[in-house]
Amino acid sequence: MASILHYFLALSLSFSFLFFLSDSVPIPQHHTNPTKPINLLVLPVQNDASTGLHWANLQKRTPLMQVPVLVDLNGNHLWVNCEQHYSSKTYQAPFCHSTQCSRANTHQCLSCPAASRPGCHKNTCGLMSTNPITQQTGLGELGQDVLAIHATQGSTQQLGPLVTVPQFLFSCAPSFLLQKGLPRNIQGVAGLGHAPISLPNQLASHFGLQHQFTTCLSRYPTSKGALIFGDAPNNMQQFHNQDIFHDLAFTPLTVTPQGEYNVRVSSIRINQHSVFPPNKISSTIVGSSGGTMISTSTPHMVLQQSLYQAFTQVFAQQLEKQAQVKSVAPFGLCFNSNKINAYPSVDLVMDKPNGPVWRISGEDLMVQAQPGVTCLGVMNGGMQPRAEVTLGTRQLEEKLMVFDLARSRVGFSTSSLHSHGVKCGDLFNFANA
């Protein structure tokens, strides 16, 4: 009996040692490639309380491990840190000038002088990866390995089995890209941009799905949201006996040369007051091309400096001046929470003057900066930001966002899911995910 106890004690200590050795967590190997056609794929997503950004546990390698990665709507591909504790029986590094390198749109050859390991081989392809928070870049090795994700038929809240992509392309990026800006313990970034080897495009290609994905980001760190790959509006119509997709409004979606998702905003109104007079709406401030980027790499809306100044002025005019208090960094306009019952709503008129309206409620804009002080969660992006308007995670949370890449359009909920009595965390049973 003593020898058995010693055995189990040693086994327990071994597992504890392995857990602390790596941020990646092993998972049970229950996965399959079903014969039934796959309608949808689901990746659970969590809200990081300290940053307001969203991350997911990707299931990769052989044996499968959970790898925590930031969700980057505009990223070109998946990149992970391979320098520490990357162990897999199925990792491969495609040779330079191979078809995999062409698919990844890279023709740069890379050779690592050290001993071979994931991320370090001779005569492979180099792929540039970016930390979307700091914009720092680094060159890494193009690799391929197993990726697993939950399948579902969309008619149930239960997640289906794990299905696999045996040779999923990604970058083994240098570890210094993880040093700043990312949530704690993150080991990489999952790019959802419209690029050849982004997560949505590889999944659609491998499983024969529609080139479409839906985001439902949870506002609450204690519940999970989801990324849904495939045609969710036609496969998830009924939820609690109601069609949660019925109030979607669509607007044209453009993709920049960098693979970023942009929409056109025709005008901005605060409590029906125009931020600019009508004859200036299409000026370079808002931009004839729209200049509005949808992003998950910032929690707050970001405006070009001139637009920010006009926006905050009109917003402040809608509230009593005596309610304003000293601003709390990094915010520029703050209020005494006890003196205000309701905050103005903001309407973004999409595409053209009579286009669909994206309404941003006070809940989607305001941030409690400290006890008794609530601030406008809109940031000054300076004179030359990446886009005149950037919509952040606060504007995307608790809404259905459908990125229909095949039709070059994006659908957005014209009301919060809360109006249906549900949250993003209710869409699926994530208990075992």
Swiss-Prot record:
Entries under Pfam families matching the protein: TAXi_C (PF14541), TAXi_N (PF14543)
Record SUPFAM superfamilies: Acid proteases (SSF50630)
Keywords: Disulfide bond, Seed storage protein, Signal, Storage protein
GO molecular function, one term: aspartic-type endopeptidase activity
GO BP of this protein: proteolysis
TM stretches of this protein: none
InterPro entries, alphabetized: Aspartic_peptidase_A1, PEPTIDASE_A1, Peptidase_aspartic_dom_sf, TAXi_C, TAXi_N, Xylanase_inhibitor_I-like
Superkingdom in the source lineage: Eukaryota
Keyword Disulfide bond assigned: yes
Segment forming the signal sequence: 1-24
Domain Peptidase A1: 54-413
Similarity-based family: Belongs to the peptidase A1 family.
UniProt subunit comment: The mature protein consists of high- and low-kDa subunits linked by disulfide bonds.
Physiological role: Seed storage protein. Has a protein kinase activity. Binds leginsulin.
Protein name: Basic 7S globulin 2
Biological source species: Glycine max
